[in-house]
């Protein structure tokens, strides 16, 4: 994951324009809002990126923790949201002191593809510990093995046409093809998971998971999973 952290901490070309970046984060924020369980909830956004519209998510909950591994991005988050008393910015290492069962909702959106399977397992273990019984982990934008880059390009162009940055998207795709992003994608690769594989991975971490009907974000070819921490208090005792 370190190489990808360095990439996103640089002046990268993953977004074809400012409008693309804004639309991307607005779509994700709106989708996250649908999962916030109550105004009293504590929400964690793991590897949140720029999280431009996090203030809207924070307004719907009691506390929003933005956890980001890239130091430069984390600095911008602190500058952007520092005055907001409902938002707390942390590094990933700073999540370790969080008490057991202190979070109602955790989201990991478009993150798993940049992590090794072992790194993802460690993140799941952390989430399982800090989520309350009945709390949920929303794992979004999971790449499927059978879906290639052409599908991602088509999803981007559809989003661009809908939101008025199609020309920028076409030029941006040409630039990105020659950028460090594609070099990294070809040399390191992106992690992909089938539905059954991810369900098994989440079950092994102690969750009760299922695939959501729709993906978080704008790419319907990718998958979102909702993994619930079992509430043992609600489990009916077995009868003889």
Q: In which residue ranges do the predicted regions lie?
A:
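A conserved beta-strand element that flanks and buttresses the S-adenosyl-L-methionine
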Residues: 107
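Helix-capping/helix-break motifs at membrane-protein junctions
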Residues: 116-117
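Conserved beta-strand/loop positions that form the S-adenosyl-L-methionine
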Residues: 46
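Class I (Rossmann-like) S-adenosyl-L-methionine-dependent methyltransferase catalytic domain
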Residues: 1-40, 49-85, 89-97, 138-240
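Structural signature of beta-strand start/N-cap positions in the alpha/beta core
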Residues: 42, 63, 102-104
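A short glycine-rich, Lys/Arg-flanked "PGG" loop and its adjoining helix->strand segment in the class I
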Residues: 121-133
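Short catalytic micro-motifs in class I SAM-dependent methyltransferases
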Residues: 110-111
């Amino acid at each position: 994951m370190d190489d990808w952290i360095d990439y996103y901490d640089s002046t990268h070309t993953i977004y074809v324009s400012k409008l693309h970046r804004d639309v991307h984060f607005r779509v994700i924020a709106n989708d996250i809002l649908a999962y916030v369980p109550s105004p009293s909830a504590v929400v964690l956004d793991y590897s949140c990126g720029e999280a431009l519209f996090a203030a809207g998510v924070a307004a719907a909950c009691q506390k929003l923790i933005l956890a980001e591994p890239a130091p430069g991005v984390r600095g911008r988050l602190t500058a952007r949201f520092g005055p907001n008393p409902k938002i707390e910015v942390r590094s990933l290492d700073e999540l370790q002191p969080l008490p057991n069962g202190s979070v109602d909702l955790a989201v990991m959106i478009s993150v798993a593809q940049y992590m090794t399977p072992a790194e993802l397992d460690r993140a799941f273990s952390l989430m399982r510990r800090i989520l309350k019984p009945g709390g949920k982990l929303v794992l979004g934008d999971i790449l499927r093995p059978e879906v290639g880059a052409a599908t991602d390009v088509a999803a981007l162009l559809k989003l661009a046409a809908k939101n008025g940055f199609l020309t920028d998207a076409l030029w941006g795709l040409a630039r990105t093809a020659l950028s460090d992003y594609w070099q990294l994608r070809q040399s390191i690769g992106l992690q992909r998971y089938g539905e059954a594989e991810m369900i098994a991975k989440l079950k092994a971490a102690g969750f009760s998971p299922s695939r959501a009907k729709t993906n978080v974000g704008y790419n319907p070819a990718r998958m979102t999973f909702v993994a619930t921490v079992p509430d043992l208090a609600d489990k009916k005792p077995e009868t003889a």
